[in-house]
Curated annotation (Swiss-Prot):
Pfam families the record matches: HGTP_anticodon, ProRS-C_1, tRNA-synt_2b
Name this protein carries in UniProt: Proline--tRNA ligase
Annotated source species: Methanococcoides burtonii (strain DSM 6242 / NBRC 107633 / OCM 468 / ACE-M)
Function: Catalyzes the attachment of proline to tRNA(Pro) in a two-step reaction: proline is first activated by ATP to form Pro-AMP and then transferred to the acceptor end of tRNA(Pro).
NCBIfam families cross-referenced by the UniProt entry: proS_fam_I
Family according to the record: Belongs to the class-II aminoacyl-tRNA synthetase family. ProS type 3 subfamily.
Notes concerning its domains: Consists of three domains: the N-terminal catalytic domain, the anticodon-binding domain and the C-terminal extension.
Lineage, uppermost ranks: Archaea, Methanobacteriati, Methanobacteriota, Stenosarchaea group, Methanomicrobia
UniProt keyword list: Aminoacyl-tRNA synthetase, ATP-binding, Cytoplasm, Ligase, Nucleotide-binding, Protein biosynthesis
Length: 478
């Protein structure tokens, strides 16, 4: 599929930028050669990973949300209603001005996000307290005219996989509880991807336009920068007032609703591939790997018996729900190992004449490279147990690496040094001026106040020296 040299090798992951670009092409995740800046094409293999990843989040949301689909085009008169919201997006909007050669009476925006597409319909759908809570989500493409350097899966002009949920509630507190639930859902989602994330409440100048507050989750990339991989916004009754979303309460009074919205994009796949991958290619958790097991016949004699054994193992694993393939191509074993290691297949099974003589197979883990002989009679149980071990091992390794790169800092100089390697945990008095001054002095940004950390100490803001019990994450970001 990809136009590449035979057995092309990746740059070392120590040079993360080159490794990342090479990985996308050689492992056949995305082709960057589409002739529109910031728009990229999924290879079928990459799209299979995407499908498996988004199946997880669909499954989590479907427990108490309903999936829907709203139009891509938003009339200008609806889009321009919420002034603060629009101010945050006006420089990024693509506009449709003509239908064919005929100018449109009303300009149409390509959705940068869907609040202004969805909420006019919510006004029609929400009538009574019995209609609440309303929890819908969709997975769609969105368009933003990014003027910064674009990068596949990370910073795009066409986001191809934007999961956005929009909920309506009777009270502010109920909406706040939904924001907390959204963050719990994201933490569980990323746990399934074996990715530890850091939730934090964004500072006021970095909240979603039109929201009361924003909580986001960030992951740490190999180069020490953080990637925002999920957001949840408490919208208060701001959008309800703009779009006239009211319900009749138990006393018969018309009351403005309170709302939330929360989203995840294909950045989740960027952090999945980047966190676990190595110099040989991808390392995928079993749940999202398109191929979970590859069987390599080692044929130098007794080919029929070896292939029969491989097919028997394949059938047994498939009956257990495992995604498995046999590579019986005429390539040498080393070339096969290279191919499937690049694709991140969690387990490789090798079966040759010697293995058959011992009624065994060789099992190799992609994440650690460990190999061991296991009985053919228990191959299914061995594979399924390894899946659990691999998942746990990947999460523990990623969590350990994250924790090692979070640094307690008390001075501006400390922060300057540590953000080159990871995330600084820094005292902050809460004043916007100090926060912005800190950003400027250290060449990094405040992510937010950790929401999963209880502070029991007293600190001094490194900018103004005021005492505070609050600390914030500071990091370089994408």
């Amino acid at each position: 599929m990809a136009e590449q040299e035979k057995e092309a090798t990746l740059p070392s992951k120590e040079n993360f930028s080159e490794w990342y670009n090479g990985m996308l092409q050689i492992a056949e995740i995305m082709d960057v050669r589409y002739p529109v800046k910031g728009s990229y094409v999924w290879y079928p293999f990459g799209f299979s990973i995407r499908r498996n990843v988004y199946d997880i989040i669909r499954g989590l949301l479907d427990k108490d949300h309903q999936e829907t689909l709203f139009p891509l085009l938003i009339p200008e008169n609806e889009f321009m209603k919420e002034a603060e919201h629009i101010k945050g997006f006006e420089e990024e909007v693509y506009w449709v001005l003509n239908g064919g050669t005929t100018p449109l009476d009303v300009k149409l925006a390509l959705r940068p996000t869907s609040e202004t597409a969805i909420y006019p319909m919510y006004r029609l759908w929400v009538r009574s307290h019995a209609d609440l809570p309303l929890k819908l989500y969709q997975i769609v493409n969105t368009f933003r005219y990014e003027t910064k350097h674009t990068r596949p899966l990370i910073r795009l002009r066409e986001i191809t996989s934007f999961k956005e949920a929009h909920t309506v509630h009777a009270t502010w507190d109920e909406a706040a509880s939904q924001v907390e639930e959204a963050i719990r859902l994201y933490i569980e989602f990323y746990k399934r991807l074996a990715i530890p994330v850091l939730p934090s409440k964004r500072p006021s100048w970095d909240k979603f336009p039109g929201a009361d507050y924003t909580i986001a989750v960030d992951s740490l990339m190999p180069d020490g920068k953080t990637l925002q991989v999920g957001t949840a916004h408490h919208l208060g009754d701001n959008f309800a007032k703009t779009f006239d979303i009211k319900y009749e309460d138990v006393d018969g009074e018309q009351v403005y609703a309170h709302q939330t919205c929360y989203g995840v994009s294909e950045r989740c796949i960027a952090t999945l591939l980047s966190t676990h991958g190595d110099d040989k290619g991808l390392v995928l958790p079993p749940e999202v790997a398109p191929t979970q097991v590859v069987i390599i016949p080692i044929i130098f004699k007794e080919p029929e018996a070896v292939l029969n054994a491989c097919n028997d193992v394949k059938a047994e694993l498939e009956a257990a729900g495992v995604r498995v393939t046999i590579d019986d191509s005429d390539k040498r074993p080393g070339s096969k190992y290279y191919k499937w290691e690049m694709k991140g297949v969690p387990l490789r099974i090798e079966i040759g004449p010697r293995d058959l003589k011992n009624e065994a197979a060789m099992l190799a883990r992609r994440d650690t490279g460990e190999k061991e002989q296991v009985p053919l009679a228990s191959i299914k149980d061995e594979v399924l147990s390894r899946f659990k071990i691999i998942q746990t091992s990947l999460l523990e390794k990623a969590t350990s690496e994250l924790n090692e790169r979070i640094f307690d800092c008390s001075t501006v100089d400390d922060v300057k040094e540590k953000v080159q390697d990871g995330i600084a945990l820094v005292p902050w008095c809460g004043e916007e001026k100090c926060g912005l001054d800190l950003d400027e002095q250290v060449g990094a940004g405040i992510l937010g106040i950790p929401t999963d950390m209880d502070e029991d100490g007293t600190y001094k803001c490194p900018i103004c020296s005021k005492e505070t019990r609050t600390r914030v994450y500071v990091a370089r970001t994408y």
